[in-house]
């Protein structure tokens, strides 16, 4: 959003203003709406994007400075060194620090700064950061010390900002000033001025002027004079009217005019008029609509006592046009606007020296364009004032006296309401105006002709007296008012009290006027009694009227009839008593004027007083109140019947208290009425007798005193009652426990209600849950609060609590379903794997935290109990177990507000999932959900059509931005219940949850490990991640993007844009009237229109034509017959499923899957290898190009199928299954298909004639029943599936499958492949080289090869072979000569195949034994350790994997060992064979009996190096050897020669010659006198039995002889005796040839004699073991000469060694 505010500017002035474009559009709209020109100061450019992003703005209460550098640019740092003041003097920083502390002490907060990714990008582009490496950002503040900043990503996708001075050690968080809700602040948009049009106030001001007033006369005269002088609405008249409107004292200008120009004072909004407040609020509402917070916080510079000046001002006219004006241009512009009827009033501070920016009030001053300075234009407008009026202080601003000097002769000085900064000063000004008018009237009276100076003086005294009387009357009326509101049973509200106060005040004014008139009438008389008597009568009438008004306020439309009657009687009685008293007073006054005696005066006064006393004593409203109080007690008794059943007795206790209270108050009222009545009667009687007037006075005083005493003790009496009942509560366990029973009872009452049980049972069924966990927040009852208030216990209770129950089918069951921690905000669901619980909130879940209460005296007889929630209030954490849980968050409190309804903070929900597949039903609250393991779903379906969500994927996390418009959210606040107990009032606060409409609300959810997201009814945007997501838009115009993964996307109702992204995606579309954009993206994607069945009503209205889809054109027309122009545009879609109606579907040149579903559909595959499925109905299917598959599943209709080009298949496998055909096994017949005739009969032999017409179709797949499938001359694939099928291939190379059942397969002509499948099958290959695919199951199959070379293949056996017998690892036993194949690994089993005419066999992956016959066989072992025997004939044997044994037997055979260590058994006399070992360590073996080596036969001559083997001296018997490593000879005299590899040569019996050749060989002579030569390499030589000879010489390497005794063995070394060095190495004898690296070791020579040879020959000399031992001893005396030493010259050999050599070598 950082860049979005730059888009949409209409001109350069708009962009220069720094106001975000979207906000500016709202400003222009408000200017038009209010018909006013709006002027603004330029906005800090670094705050522009923050305002657009939704950051809150500061009011006047924040004096700290913002920052213009670094990552904190645009914000207000708590550390002044990070602000724009960085580098300033220490005292400047200290003052700034004080400003920060002051802001934090007055409702603001210190917030850790976090930035969005877009904000970081903006800061880089703006050059405020110089780079980033490893999360550290360098930021230079020019000319000062460098700071380093670090950003760290937080869990909600933002970046926390930390800082340190360069080179410092630890980073710390950058803190900025935020509002009370914790939202960081940036600069607001300052209004410079507002110029409303005169029409905004002219008419209202004119209509509200009061007639008869000297000020009004002045207004009228000046208006007429201005009109006559100008003849129109020129500037002078506008200025004049504006001055009058600004003067606007309440005595002269009406309410509507004051609405435009009244002032208020507030530390955050400053001095602001109501009109300015309306404009400000309208601007902020517009800002909210585009996602911003309040953007304008306070009034204009016109009201600022310390205004600032700007080089430029941004102006928006009332027509919405905008421009940027310099100070010089502003003067001309304001003049033009004034001429058009727009009003501009100027700030007095502008006229102070050093602050003037204008010549003659509006002039030009130099400055830097666009800069903001410390003063701005100002000219003070004034109105007349009286001398000595105290003006509110303007600080250093000097006072100016200017303006008009007179107002009808009133005053000679001017004062300015523009200087007034609070309401108290306004009231003072109005009183001063009133006083001036009165004095003006007095002076005018003094000047009247015919009135003497003494009379004028008396009149002045009378006026003063009248004013004194009026003041006294106000006091009396106030007493009457308190009396009225103090009566028992009074139910007046504070609003009613305010209205009554106004009425009494007006009555006092009227009484004052009467008193003044009477006094004036008797002007010149010295008698005061008449005037004051009338005044007393007027006071009595005022009291009566006050009481009558109090009663009249209860006459509402919904008041009970009894209350209306009592009020009517009260009004009549009070007005009658007051009128009588006033009449007697007037009569008294007239009598006094005529000189009546003072006794008559007293009598009159007594009679009037008696009438008033009687009226006061008989109060119908008081009687009605006592009766109603008694009825209320009866109602409480009814409540108590139910609450007592659940353990709460408080309602019964409160009922009894009210009965006791009624009795006490009734007694007091009765005695009072008797006293008043007796006193009134005595007074009237005494007054009638005249002479008894003194008695009447005394009686009235006495009864009045007694009544006063009686009424005075009434309140203590009922307070004692309250204390008695408080003690009862203490005795019953104390107030805390007592009132908790009320919460428990209310919980039990709801939990056991039939309505709740039914609702929860329905929820359980709808959610497919095993149980429902109900969480209930219960508020205390109003009656319980009332009882607590009366007994003084309102601070000793909880007003709300949370309860949890588990329900199954609506019935409450035992067990603790969750662990609940209200104080910490924790809900842990105790669930196990396999369960499906559901969590729902029966009543809205209140905020977490604990309740603290305190009772405080807030008035004379008023107490208020305050409640505060403390502890963790901003989050509920819900933990799920291992079950598949549904969590319904629809009724959760989203916001916490204070007692004034001001938002404190939002409440976040944190949901931690477990191992199951969970579903979370979200609401307006901000949630963080971690789904954990399983497939998890979050649904926003509860959101309304006006709301929307935007879901973005961030790796494994989703961020969900919820835009809620006109949102209803549950919010918890503090409500107050007022209880009047006599004259005591108790205001009790309690926790209260309500569903509130909050207008616009934006919340961001974070979701992790969530796969499925469901949108709401609004216009949503949902983007998936790399997993396989299920995304549903719901109603509204949605945008879905699956991203990577195989996603399922549901657009729902509305005009949707759906993008699949990477992966194989599925689009589920409704057959609605909306047009959608569908883009499959990469992968193989499918769109389905068969999700919802249209209703009968829709079908009746819209017909049965479904869609016209063409993937090549990229369009899907819905309801085309109605021309609704409802078209989905599709691209990158490979597969399409139609609707349940009659569809027309065409694919494209890709491989499509096209389904018609129900209805009579027409489908064209076009190019590609397509899958076409008509579904139910009469369908026409065209495969066209490509190898197509037709899926048939409706046996009750006849379809038309044309395969077109390619190899096409019609598949009936899905047609017959449970539910498709009534009693499907009744006959057991499936289909009958004959491709040569072009038809397929469905439900064959059942008397039904449903045929599919098939053309250009090569392949058929049958049903699970008994099918007959016949091919044609083409190469067909025919698959029988289940049932006893008959399958005939016909001509061509066919592929036939029998499937399950006892099938008959006939290959007929051609090279066919036949698979019988399970069941006892008969397979006949017919002509051609056929292939029989078999499995070693328990069935008995018959295989007849027929003509040609045929093969039976058991390679698909897998691990099934041999399982039944327990001989795991054994495969088949096949003997083609015997015509039998045992399939369970042993001969004679019941599971065998009968084979005939079969030449070749392929074994299993296990250990098979396969024997050929006299024919030329191909036997393949496949996997396992197989034994293959070719028998007669020229055979081919292939061992395959495993260590196989191969024997070609007779014939010229080819044997291939392939992988594994294979063993070839070969007859040396059988020539012409090829033995190829393949991979592994392979051996050819001539040792076996019957190998052609009889008594007269010769041995084997074999050379692995040359690759042949034959009989000795008979090369014509040669066989070819390849890849053979080892050889085993015969029992004759053999010659075995190795190759360059590591060979094992075993001579067996006979006198053999073994030559290893190169490589590390192993030679085994075995029996006989053998000759062993290891040759090159390190060889091991085993002579075995017999007289063996070992050859060794130079170049032979390191050979080892292993002797085991027996025979006379000899070592022959090709070297001279003097070239040999003998040494003992452990038990071994080592013989080395000097000058070489060759050595011969005789293993275990020193162990015993059996391991020694009898002689060693070197050249012509020999040595025996004894001589060898002597040489070893002799040579041990000399250093080992090493490999490079040559034979020592005789001259150098010591004599002793020479003697030893000569003696031992002979």
From Swiss-Prot:
- Ranges occupied by Hemolysin-type calcium-binding repeats: 1014-1031, 1032-1049, 1050-1067, 1155-1172, 1173-1190, 1279-1296, 1297-1314, 1315-1332, 1335-1352, 1411-1428, 1429-1446, 1447-1464, 1468-1484, 1537-1554, 1555-1572, 1573-1590, 1603-1620
Q: In this UniProt entry, which residues carry a covalently attached lipid of the kind N6-palmitoyl lysine?
A: 860, 983
| Primary residence | secreted
Q: Which domain of life is it from?
A: Bacteria
Q: What is an example of a GO molecular function annotated in this UniProt entry? A: calcium- and calmodulin-responsive adenylate cyclase activity
> Which Pfam family name is an example for this entry?
Anthrax_toxA
**Any one of the GO BP annotations:** killing of cells of another organism
**Region listing for Required for interaction with CyaC, in residue ranges:** 500-698
The record's section on InterPro entries has: Anthrax_toxin_C-terminal, Anthrax_toxin_edema_cen, Anthrax_toxin_edema_cen_sf, Haemolys_ca-bd, Hemolysin-typ_Ca-bd_CS, Hemolysn_Ca-bd, RTX_pore_form, RTX_toxin/Mannuronan_C5-epim
Q: Which residues bind ATP?
A: 349-356
**EC number assigned by the record:** 4.6.1.1
Q: List cystine links.
A: none
Question: Region annotation C: residue ranges?
Answer: 913-1656
Signal sequence span is none
Region (D, Asp/Gly-rich) location? 1657-1706
Q: Where is this chain's protein located in or outside the cell? A: Secreted
Report what the Swiss-Prot or TrEMBL entry states about this protein's PTMs: Released in a processed form.
Query: Residues annotated as region B, Ala/Gly-rich?
Result: 400-912
* Domain writeup: The Gly-rich region is probably involved in binding calcium, which is required for target cell-binding or cytolytic activity.
Q: What does this protein do?
A: Bifunctional adenylate cyclase toxin-hemolysin that plays a crucial role in host colonization. It causes whooping cough by acting on mammalian cells by elevating cAMP-concentration and thus disrupts normal cell function.
Q: What is this protein called?
A: Bifunctional hemolysin/adenylate cyclase
Gene that encodes the chain: cya
